[in-house]
From Swiss-Prot:
Role of this protein: Involved in transcription antitermination. Required for transcription of ribosomal RNA (rRNA) genes. Binds specifically to the boxA antiterminator sequence of the ribosomal RNA (rrn) operons.
Database matches in Pfam families: NusB (PF01029)
Descriptive protein name: Transcription antitermination protein NusB
One of the protein's GO biological processes: transcription antitermination
Family designation: Belongs to the NusB family.
GO cellular component labels: cytosol
Recorded name of the encoding gene: nusB
Family matches, as Gene3D superfamilies: NusB-like
Keyword terms, alphabetized: RNA-binding, Transcription, Transcription antitermination, Transcription regulation
Length: 138
């Protein structure tokens, strides 16, 4: 598994856990990271960036998700799906070094692993809607 995929999976677990625990996400990183995993250090760094970015820009991210999710309030979304969307939205809005199609494809792959049967299509629909309104990165 690549370092960024590992980082996304770690970040998802931290963001999801943080929704249910009062406190910081950093201690959770120790619980979910297997140091022997190839790419663990780079994955940890990327996960840390994603989590901090989502937390710092959460209001703007949630506003964008709400605007693109027709008939779905954030409160009705599955927590795993919402965490994946927040993570991907941070990448789309604030990480110019990651192409939009890579962000969307990675979010779909993470959703296949951690979400429900309907999660990949749901996440793809919202992210495609948002990505179509953003300028190309480059």
């Amino acid at each position: 598994m690549g370092a960024r995929r590992l980082g996304r999976e770690l970040a998802l677990q931290m963001l999801y856990s943080r929704d249910y625990a009062a406190g910081e996400a950093a201690p959770l990183l120790e619980l979910v990271l297997d140091e022997s995993e190839p790419g663990a250090a780079a994955g940890r760094s990327f996960a840390d960036d994603l989590v901090r970015g989502v937390l710092e820009h959460r209001q703007e991210i949630d506003t964008a998700i709400t605007g693109a999710s027709k008939n779905w309030s954030i409160g009705r979304m599955a927590r795993v799906d919402l965490s994946i969307l927040r993570m991907a939205m941070y990448e789309l809005l604030f990480r110019s070094d990651i192409p939009k199609n890579v962000t969307i494809n990675e979010a779909i792959e993470v959703a296949k692993k951690f979400g429900t049967e309907d999660s990949p299509a749901f996440i793809n629909g919202i992210l495609d809607e948002i990505a179509s309104t953003l300028p190309d990165k480059g």
